[in-house]
Amino acid sequence: MGDKKSPTRPKRQPKPASDEGYWDCSVCTFRNSAEAFKCMMCDVRKGTSTRKPRPVSQLVAQQVTQQFVPPTQSKKEKKDRVEKDKSEKEAASKKNCHKKTRPRLKNVDRSSAQHLEVTVGDLTVIITDFKEKAKSAPASSAAGDQHSQGSCSSDSTERGVSRSSSPRGEASSLNGESH
């Protein structure tokens, strides 16, 4: 009786000898070279199991407590809060619907706008160039304050903010400095 073989179950085929230099990744099934310690596609270590890891008891307990937080407010207080939130959202949406606000930089002097038109083909783009605001100096350097208030344009050309087409040498000679 021990000599009978099950006809319904085929035997497992041995792997061909040509696969000796490779191993298949258990996650992405990529065929890696035998020298590779990690999968070249998904960086999973060689021999890593694809089984789901056991849940850590501390993590499970933490997730359970987060799921079942008991309600602390009464139904009446909750209802009042929901109505208040709705009225605030409606008021905010009414304010925003007729005025769109653009993000603005804080260190820009808006009164110093220069408009440049650039046309390429049939497309014209207007570039608005602003100068940087003069930074307020600390109270301890009174002499420095007087210098920075004397001439706004010379201050900006010294820092290289101006988009003048003149070279740096000419810009510094305009400030009263000689070389």
Swiss-Prot record:
Residues 74-93 have a biased composition (Basic and acidic residues). One of its GO terms (molecular function) is zinc ion binding. The modification Phosphoserine is found at S166. It holds the Pfam family Zn_ribbon_RanBP. Keywords: Metal-binding, Nucleus, Phosphoprotein, Transcription, Transcription regulation, Zinc, Zinc-finger. Residues 146-155 have a biased composition (Polar residues). In the mesoderm, expressed in the region close to the surface ectoderm. The keyword Metal-binding applies. GO terms for biological process: negative regulation of DNA-templated transcription; positive regulation of DNA-templated transcription. Residues 95-105 have a biased composition (Basic residues). A zinc finger (RanBP2-type) spans 19-48. Residues 62-73, 162-173 have a biased composition (Low complexity). The keyword Transcription regulation applies. One of its GO terms (cellular component) is cytosol. Residues 1-23, 47-117, 133-179 are annotated as: Disordered. It is found in: Nucleus. Its main location: nucleus. InterPro entries: RYBP/YAF2, YAF2_RYBP, Znf_RanBP2, Znf_RanBP2_sf. Binds to MYC and inhibits MYC-mediated transactivation. Also binds to MYCN and enhances MYCN-dependent transcriptional activation. Increases calpain 2-mediated proteolysis of YY1 in vitro. Component of the E2F6.com-1 complex, a repressive complex that methylates 'Lys-9' of histone H3, suggesting that it is involved in chromatin-remodeling. Interacts with MYC, MYCN, RNF2/RING1B and YY1. Part of the E2F6.com-1 complex in G0 phase composed of E2F6, MGA, MAX, TFDP1, CBX3, BAT8, EUHMTASE1, RING1, RNF2, MBLR, L3MBTL2 and YAF2. This is YY1-associated factor 2. The lineage of its organism: Eukaryota, Metazoa, Chordata, Craniata, Vertebrata.
